[in-house]
């Protein structure tokens, strides 16, 4: 997951780690599968993050997508990124 994020989106190492961890937690919870009837895969995540505005970092894109899921289904707020440790960034 982290490698796929690095290839496609700007962000810091800490953001990539945090988003990858949140994605694992979301997948383990099987919430997307239950709500949308589809498996949560790296491709599904990347496709949805690509829909976010271009100027957003990877963590902001993640929160943008999770915000949409929260509005549509509820129960996604706990998977959003709240804080990210400071780290080196990739553009």
Protein language model annotation of sequence segments:
Residues 1-91:
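Acidic, polar-rich N-terminal leader regions of halophilic archaeal proteins
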């Amino acid at each position: 997951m982290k490698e796929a994020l690095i290839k496609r989106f700007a962000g810091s190492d800490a953001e990539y780690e945090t988003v990858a961890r949140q994605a694992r937690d979301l997948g383990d919870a099987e919430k997307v599968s239950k709500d949308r009837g589809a498996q949560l895969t790296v491709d599904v995540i990347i496709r949805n993050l690509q829909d976010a505005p271009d100027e957003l970092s990877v963590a902001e894109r993640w929160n943008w997508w999770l915000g949409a899921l929260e509005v549509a289904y509820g129960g996604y707020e706990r998977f959003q990124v709240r804080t990210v440790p400071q780290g080196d960034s990739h553009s």
